[in-house]
């Protein structure tokens, strides 16, 4: 079972990764997406078909978080490939994330332990690092303003950025397609849950 851990620059990252996996002949991944991302009907249509399930980050109840973790643990344990953004939110500055969120990512370890305990066939869980490189970022203006603001580092959810407007997303897509530029999705070498590189021949 694979756990993909990409860098995170835009709300378009998840659909882009889903498309890249499809083009590479790789299986799709399930992933948690903020409830605010489903406010755009067009993107909601595609995201729900790319394996996204909703996560309401405004809910702080312990029960809600436990249910999300149990769902993720069970899905990975049953062999569902998963995607987690280890930074937890989009990078405001474009730099690689250093303050990693271990919440849902930790469910991979729990799923692996449960699989070993129940002696399931093929219990191995591998982490695949992934980087994204863009010429343009849809929400760049909003993210830059947020990074420069005093409260930028503490804000977690931006619910009214460019992604919420279907017309803006369509206009952005046209501009990107008219550029002589490429978007890169790079998959790194798989690692086991202890961080050790895995021999490709053993996969």
What spans do the regions from the language model cover?
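Soluble catalytic domains of membrane acyltransferases
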Residues: 1-192, 196
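C-terminal, non-catalytic macromolecule-binding modules
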Residues: 200-203
């Amino acid at each position: 079972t694979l756990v993909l851990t990409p860098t995170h620059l835009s709300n378009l990252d998840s659909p882009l990764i889903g498309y890249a996996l499809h083009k590479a002949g790789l299986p799709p991944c399930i992933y948690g997406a903020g409830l605010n991302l489903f406010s755009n009907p067009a993107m909601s249509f595609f995201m729900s078909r790319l394996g996204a399930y909703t996560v309401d980050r405004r809910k702080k109840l312990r029960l809600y978080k436990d249910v999300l973790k149990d769902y993720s643990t069970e899905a990975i344990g049953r062999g569902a490939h998963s995607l987690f953004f280890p930074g937890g939110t989009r990078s405001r500055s474009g730099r690689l994330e250093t303050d990693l969120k271990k919440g849902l990512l930790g469910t991979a370890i729990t799923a692996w332990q449960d699989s070993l305990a129940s002696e399931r066939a093929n219990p191995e869980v591998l982490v695949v690092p992934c980087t994204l490189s863009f010429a343009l970022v849809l929400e760049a203006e909003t993210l830059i303003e947020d990074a420069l603001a005093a409260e930028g580092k503490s804000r977690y959810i931006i619910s009214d950025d460019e992604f919420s407007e279907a017309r803006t997303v369509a206009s952005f897509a046209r501009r990107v397609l008219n550029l002589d530029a490429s978007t890169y999705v790079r998959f790194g070498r798989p690692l086991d849950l202890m961080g050790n590189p895995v021999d490709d021949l053993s996969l």
